[in-house]
Design a protein with these regions (language model features):
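C-terminal, charged low-complexity interaction regions
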Residues: 145, 150-165
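Short amphipathic alpha-helical segments that predominantly mediate membrane engagement
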Residues: 1-144, 162-165
């Protein structure tokens, strides 16, 4: 049984379902708790940090978002679709890249091409992270720091390590 999680559209963690019960007493307690929750004690519809709508299912396939011990997923495990917080961060990074006067249009295109690779652990992730790091050296601070902050929330641990975050 998959343990579900609730996040807001911007990616703030809201809650996780209780772990599955292990014995009959726990099953009964969980059933009573669910009954009580259905009588009015539900999660808020909106995030208390930012006011965005809370979701517990994928917008595309409607399957529940799997809880992964506090590690926010970037993509749906059922259909592979990016979650809204992933789309939002990548969109903001692309928009910000277009504003960087230090880069040519070819460089901007190449930098934007690294973003998707930085959100998944593949054989191309270290290469994309190395390219990203080079572009950050080229644009310099504070632009590089701003762009790093935008993408940091959706990068894999391997990408963060290579980039130095």
């Amino acid at each position: 049984m998959i343990r579900g999680a609730t996040y807001c559209l911007k990616g703030h963690f809201v809650s996780a379902e209780d772990p599955p019960p292990r014995d009959w007493d726990q099953i009964q307690e969980a059933a009573l708790r669910e009954f009580d929750e259905d009588q009015g004690r539900k999660l808020p519809a909106f995030c208390t940090d930012c006011g965005s709508e809370n979701i517990s299912t994928c917008n595309r396939c409607q399957k529940k978002i799997a809880f992964n011990n506090g590690r926010r997923p970037q993509y749906c495990g059922w259909c592979g679709s990016p979650f809204p917080w992933t789309v939002g961060a990548l969109s903001a990074a692309r928009e910000y890249t277009d504003e960087l006067d230090q880069l040519s249009s070819e460089d901007k295109t190449a930098l934007k091409a690294t973003f998707d690779e930085l959100t998944t652990d593949t054989a191309r992730t270290p290469l994309a992270a190395t390219h990203f790091k080079r572009f950050m050296e080229k644009v310099g601070s504070p632009a590089a720091e701003i762009l790093k902050k935008i993408v940091e929330t959706v990068l894999t641990e391997a990408a963060k390590k290579t980039i130095g975050l």
